[in-house]
Amino acid sequence: MRVLRAFSSPWLPAMSLLMAGAAAQASDAIGLPAPFGSANAPSSANTPPLANAAAATAHLSHGRFKDLLVYSPAGVPKSFVLFLSGDEGWNSAADAMARQLVEQGAMVAAIDWARFKANLEADGDECLFADGDLENLSHFVQAYFHAPTYLTPMLVGVSSGAAMAYSMLAQAPRNTFAAALTLGFCPNFNLQKPLCGGSGLKFARGTGGHGVDLLPIKNLGNPWVDLHGELDRSCPAGAAGNFISQVRGAAIVSLPTVTHDFTSPRGWMPQYTAGFNALVARNAAARTAPPPASLSDLPIVEVPAQPAAAPADVFAIIMSGDGGWAGIDQDVAAALSARGIPVVGLDSLRYYWTARTPSGLAADTDRMIRYYLTHFGKQRVLLIGYSQGADVLPFAVNRLPESSRARIALTAVMGMSEHALFEFHLSSWVSDSNSGPATLPEIDRITGMPVLCIYGADENDSLCPKLDPKRFIVVKLKGGHHFDGDYANLAHQILAAARPTSAE
């Protein structure tokens, strides 16, 4: 095994060492169980064996995914994988690969790429947004199996599934997926209907009018490793390596004896196992430092302030949307941080994984306000909510003790709907829900502070237009629920509406 290129990312050297160690053991003494290794091959205690234990399996259907096979490990899963097969569908080779990941503690959702592709291309849309389907599936499966907390999914893909895995990492908002591990990635992608660009995916019409040619983007935002056979004739390693060399944080691992079919596990299974475990470890290490002991029960993220000419006297608490701390939440936090405002993010996906109440949310918000006023040395707080976080925020504000309410410079809601949910249900991932308490009466109760309601011109279910403009600051911006990605403007609108600060 040789790492052709490992591009600038702090976790890659450790991964390279780990994978090199695995490759050094890929010899006749590797000890893979039949039928993949010699029946007389001695075992190696240091080499991850091919999975031969029976994994628990179940079938379920959700959205585009019918009769989906899900593999579960013994005990609580350490990671969650969305595994995209090759064009041949979910066959014995894909099954063996999935079971090896289950042996590493992963829960694996087996996605038959041929069926998924046909389902996508049957839609009438001009281009395909599939990242939401996969994220939704991850939510649904983990809730269905009562995972104790939500695990950000890793994408694993083979051949065309590898191209899809890269495409989803590029299309989705940052941190929707933890990482991608691919086998036999090829930039030429056999799709009759193109994918939508999303957060950064780029492509051109395929050579000869066949499919699309994926184009490298400079930074995926999350790591990607491709295992590639040097004997691959379908997509030579050089072409894949040239593509991956242009993507920051990506790496390609060269496998000297492997073809595009990955038929001989002896030549790639150790690297596959070690690479997967390295990505899982990287994901765990990349998580922010744990919150202080007094807040250790809350899924919070700290975003420190960047140096500013005139530091603000406020900090911000952002309650994320139901997708968790990703995309718009992170970008608004970064925009505020750049203006000298530290941010504390509450990950709604993980917070509401178990049932909450308005009074409980208020108590937790009060704890955060009191702790971080002292920790950051600030006088006031901006309370900000997006989507689900916006829906629940007024319930917290109205139940705060007066000592904390007096510190609020602004309550800002973005993409607010008409009902609030304080717990995730399986139905939440099937359709929009009108259950839960109404948000209009609750936001109407807020007094004694400015309240900003931001909505997108293309949103048709926003509560903001129903608010009294004499009492509330109502701002309509271009775009839909994600405001066309203009997060710097969101930060500007928030600070402009707040009681005077030194940040603007």
At which residue positions do the language-model features occur?
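N-terminal cap/lid segment of alpha/beta-hydrolase-fold proteins
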Residues: 30-37, 49-76, 270-309
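Acidic beta-to-alpha connecting loop that harbors the catalytic carboxylate
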Residues: 84-87, 230-233, 257-259, 319, ...
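Short, surface-exposed "cap/lid" segments of acyl-processing enzymes
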Residues: 74-104, 306-339, 348
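Conserved alpha/beta-hydrolase
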Residues: 102-120, 336-353
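Alpha/beta-hydrolase active-site loop
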Residues: 124-147, 355-376, 395
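Primarily recognizes the serine-hydrolase "nucleophile elbow" in alpha/beta-hydrolase
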Residues: 144-145, 149-210, 380-434, 442
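C-terminal catalytic histidine-bearing segment of alpha/beta-hydrolase fold enzymes
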Residues: 250-301, 472-504
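The feature captures the conserved acid-bearing segment of alpha/beta-hydrolase catalytic domains
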Residues: 190-245, 422-471
